From Swiss-Prot:
Signal peptide: none annotated. GO terms for cellular component: cytosolic small ribosomal subunit. The gene is rpsO. SUPFAM superfamilies: S15/NS1 RNA-binding domain. Gene3D superfamilies: 6.10.250.3130, S15/NS1, RNA-binding. It comes from Variovorax paradoxus (strain S110). This is Small ribosomal subunit protein uS15.
């Protein structure tokens, strides 16, 4: 789990309004933070298959949110992936 202070910072950086916690941008940013925190764990614990399943679930959920955002507003989608560095 990510620390509350890091989570609050991620929400503040990606929120569209003052108390925005549910927009796709915030959800994708939080999932990205959790994924980035878990990724090094699997470099040292390669046989943690149950944990890997959770990671793949998060990646899949992030992909679905990004697909939704792309279909609704392509400009916000491109800005978000550039900000988070998700695509090359």
């Amino acid at each position: 789990m990510i620390a509350a202070s890091i989570k609050a910072e991620v929400v503040k950086d990606n929120a569209r309004a003052a108390n925005d916690t549910g927009s796709p941008e915030v959800q994708v940013a939080l999932l990205t933070a959790r994924i980035n925190e878990l990724t090094p764990h699997f470099k040292t614990h390669a046989k943690d298959h149950h944990g890997r399943r959770g990671l793949l679930r998060m990646v899949s959920r992030r992909r679905k949110l990004l697909d939704y955002l792309k279909s609704k507003d392509a400009d916000r989608y491109t800005a978000l992936i550039a900000k988070l560095g998700l695509r090359k």
